[in-house]
């Protein structure tokens, strides 16, 4: 299960590797900024 971590009022849910692989993106480091931001917005919540 993902473990939430809180930093300055922001909670980030860190999925495991299998969950990121399910996005269909073979290498997250090759994403440009806009798709990366879109993907990460699903894993962060304000307190």
Swiss-Prot record:
**What is one Pfam family matched by this protein?**
Fasciclin
* Disulphide connectivity of cysteines: none
Q: Which InterPro entries match?
A: FAS1_dom_sf, FAS1_domain
Q: Where is the FAS1 domain?
A: 1-47
Cited PROSITE patterns:
FAS1
Q: What does this protein do?
A: May be a cell surface adhesion protein.
What the record says about family reads: Belongs to the fasciclin-like AGP family.
Protein name (record): Fasciclin-like arabinogalactan protein
């Amino acid at each position: 299960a993902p473990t939430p971590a809180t930093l300055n009022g922001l909670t980030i849910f860190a999925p495991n590797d299998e969950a990121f692989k399910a996005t269909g993106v073979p290498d997250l480091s090759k994403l440009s900024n806009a798709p990366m931001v879109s993907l990460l917005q699903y894993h962060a919540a304000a307190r």
